[in-house]
Design a protein with these regions (language model features):
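Acidic, divalent-metal-binding catalytic cores of TOPRIM
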Residues: 1-257
Length: 257
């Protein structure tokens, strides 16, 4: 988040709590009209299958077992979602946000395949395996890139994978949309000064990239100054950013607020 926004979750006023498995509800119940009156975003996986789980004639036992495994995870994910929605229905302080599959798969789906490609030499030593993994991660088929992402996470370890990916994160990373919505729910009102600092940070990156024409940067700098001075509002400067630099990753963030 800090690489993209220039400010961390802590600096936004958001605390990140890592809770395993079913522990969500035990902590989330604290956020209530009669308890802690602050917003809480629950972020977890829906675990939808990346393959067709229908067993057909001719499937080998290995294929059948693989399909059953994916189906089982999917059913647990659907049950998890239903349980969370039922538990906190009517509670305005809590909302749940789900990766369609898992974080690793959705991270690649969001457009971050290159980040995963960058860690392959750290995960595999065999050149043929690296080549196969590269082809799968670059595929548009979720069954291929999803399976490779899951294989890396399961074999290398999710914690170790997170550390490796963390070293590859840069300002051009695409934050998965479900995470952005979770951030926006937890912190729906961002002060103008914070937005100015975020956009100023992104503009400085553009000014230094040796690709973006400086006249375009200078023109947006005028709009940003007008925003700081109250001459245009957040929606106005958001639209100006999208118009001037449509490919900048900050637009992913701006559109959810």
């Amino acid at each position: 988040v800090k690489k993209v926004l220039g400010v961390s979750l802590d600096e936004l006023g958001i605390s990140l709590i890592n809770i395993r498995s079913t522990g969500f509800q035990n902590v989330a119940v604290l956020f209530h009209d009669d308890r802690i009156r602050k917003r809480c975003s629950i972020v977890t996986d829906l675990d939808m299958s990346i393959i067709d789980t229908t067993i057909i004639a001719g499937d080998t036992e290995d294929v059948k077992n693989r399909k059953k495994k994916y189906l089982g995870s999917q059913e647990k994910g659907i049950a998890r979602k239903a349980s969370l929605e039922m538990a906190f229905s009517g509670n305005p302080w809590i909302s749940s946000f789900f990766a369609s599959h898992t974080f690793e798969v959705d991270f690649v789906s969001a457009g971050n395949a290159r980040k995963m490609l960058g860690i392959l030499p750290d995960v595999y030593k065999d050149k043929a395996t690296i080549a196969t993994a590269k082809a799968e991660l670059e595929s548009a088929d979720v069954a291929l890139y999803g399976q490779r992402a899951l294989t890396i996470a399961n074999n290398y370890g999710k914690g170790c994978l997170a550390i490796l990916l963390g070293k590859r994160i840069d300002p051009d990373v695409t934050i998965p949309e479900y995470i952005l919505h979770a951030i926006a729910f937890a912190h729906p009102t961002v002060k103008k000064e914070v937005w100015f600092n975020v956009l100023d940070y992104r503009l400085k990156l553009l000014e230094d990239d040796l690709v973006t024409p400086l006249e375009e940067c200078n023109e947006f700098r005028k709009k940003l100054t007008a925003f700081r001075n109250g001459e245009i509002d957040f929606v106005g400067v958001r639209n100006e950013m999208l118009s001037a630099f449509p490919g900048d990753r900050i637009n992913d963030v701006l559109k959810v607020f």
